[in-house]
Swiss-Prot record:
One of its GO terms (molecular function) is heme binding. The lineage of its organism: Eukaryota, Fungi, Dikarya, Ascomycota, Pezizomycotina. It comes from Emericella nidulans (strain FGSC A4 / ATCC 38163 / CBS 112.46 / NRRL 194 / M139). Its EC number is 1.14.-.-. Pathway: Mycotoxin biosynthesis; sterigmatocystin biosynthesis. Cytochrome P450 monooxygenase; part of the gene cluster that mediates the biosynthesis of sterigmatocystin (ST), a polyketide-derived furanocoumarin which is part of the most toxic and carcinogenic compounds among the known mycotoxins. The first step in the biosynthesis of sterigmatocystin is the production of hexanoate by the fatty acid synthase (FAS) units stcJ and stcK. The polyketide backbone is assembled by the non-reducing polyketide synthase stcA by condensation of the starter hexanoyl-CoA and 7 malonyl-CoA extender units followed by cyclization and release of norsolorinic acid. PANTHER family: CYTOCHROME P450, CYTOCHROME P450 MONOOXYGENASE ASQL-RELATED. The keyword Iron applies. This is Cytochrome P450 monooxygenase stcF. Heme binds at residue 424. InterPro entries: Cyt_P450 (IPR001128), Cyt_P450_CS (IPR017972), Cyt_P450_E_grp-I (IPR002401), Cyt_P450_sf (IPR036396), Cytochrome_P450_monoxygenase (IPR050121). It is an enzyme of class 1 (oxidoreductase). Its cofactor is heme. The gene is stcF.
Amino acid sequence: MILPLILVLYLLSTAAYRLWLHPLRNYPGPCWWAVWRVPYLKGTIRGTIVRDIQRLHNQYGPVVRIAPDELSYITPEAAKPIYTSSPEFPKDPMHLPPFHNGAPGILAADYAHHRRYRRLLASAFSEKGLRAQQGMIQSHIDRLMTRLQGNCSSGSLDMTVWFNWATFDIIGDLAFGEPFGCLERMETNPWIASIQGNVKSIPILNALRRYRLDRLIEFLAPPRLLEMRRRNAQFTAEKVDRRLKHATTTRGDLWDSVLADPPDGEPPMSRAEMVSNASAIVLAGSETSATTLSGCLWLLLTNPEYLQQLTERIRARFSTATVIDAQTVTQIQGLQAVLDESLRLYPAVPMQSNRIVPPPGARLAGSWVPGGTSVAVQQFAACRSPTNFHRPDEFIPERWEKEGEFINDRREASQPFSIGPRNCIGRQLALAEMRLILVHLLWHFDIELDRRRMENMDWMAVQGIWILWDKKPLWVVLKNRST
C-alpha cells in the first residue's frame, strides 16, 4: 500500500513542479505536454509529431512548450542564435541516432569532430569537386530517362521509386566510385530498404534510451526494424572495407580526398568514422533529393498551370536534351522558385535538429531560456505558419519573386538545408541533381497524374513522418513528348 502511495505522491509533485515552479512554466503549451513527455513520444513513434507540433503552434503561437524541458519555435529570430551561435548550442543527444559502432558521423558529431569531418570532406563537395562529377551525374540521369522511355508505355509508374533509384545510384558513384545498379537492374537495392528501416527505428530507439531501457531494445523494438538497422550497418561497413582495399587508387569519389594527406593538423578518419560518415552521406545524399523531387512533382501535377508554364519554358530554352547541363538549367525562369516552394511545403527533413541551450541560458526570440533546455525550429510548422507566409498552404512559386501580395513573406523562415556551420554540406550537389532531373523529365515527357490509381488520395497529407517522410506511391502517366 505504501509503494503505490509513494508513486502517486511522486507523480503529483512532479506534475506540480513542472506546471508551477519549473523555469519554463511561463511558456505557452498544453499542460499534459508540459508535465510528461508521453504525448511527444507517442506522436514520434506514430509518425504524427510534426503535424502535432504544427497544430500546437497554430493554437499557442510562435513558441510552444512541447515537453517538460523542450521548446519549439517557428520564427527566424529564434533560428539564428540556436543554429549559428559561437560557441555553438550543442546537439541534444536524446534526439540523435544511437551509434552502432561508437563513432558518430557528420550528422551527429560534436563540434570538434564535425569541424574535422567537414574539412576532410570539403573538397569533394566544393564547386570544383562538383564540376568534376558532372559527367557522372549526367550519365545516371541519361540512364533514368532511357529506362523511363522504355517503361512508360506499359502504364503509370511510381515516380517515388524511380527517383530513389536515380539518386541512390548517383550517391553510390560519388561515395564509393561505383553505382548501386538500381537503374541498371530496375530493382531496389536492399540497402535502400535497410536505410529507410533504420531511419524509422531511430525514434523508437531514442524513446527507449530516454527511459534507460537500452538493454531491453532487443525485446521492445520491432524485430523487423532492428534487422533493418543491422543490415544497414553491415552494408555500409562492407562498402567501406571494399573501398579501403583500393585506398591508394584514385576513383573519383569523395574518399579520394579523405584518404589523401589530411589538412595540416587534422588526424585522418578512422575506419569506424568512415563507416558512420558513409552511412550519413548515403542517406542524406539520396533519400532527401528523391523526396524533394517526388514532392515537387506532386505539387506540379496538382497545380497544372505551373506544370504547363515550367514545361513550356524548359522546351523553349533547349532545342535538344544534349545541351541541358548544370549551368544552363540555372537560367530557366521560375525553376528555382518551383524548387524553393516545393521545399517550403514539403521539406525533405521536416524537423530541424534539437540543440541544448548552454548554461546559464540565452535569449531566444526576445525571451530568456534557461540552460539545459532543448530547443529547435520546426521547419514544417514554420513554413506552414501564416505568421511567416501569406496563404501558407498554397503552392505559389511566385512568392519567391519577393513582390506583390507576398512581399512581406518571411522567406528566411524556410531553411531546408539548415543554417550555420552545420548546414548541409551537400546543398549544391542536391540542387544541381534536382534541377537536372526535373528539367530532363519535363523536357522528355508529357506527364499527368494517374488519378485512378491514386484514388483521389492527398499524397502529402497521408504520409507519416519518422524523421523523414514515409512516402506513398506516386503514380504518374508519362508520354514521350509530342512536339
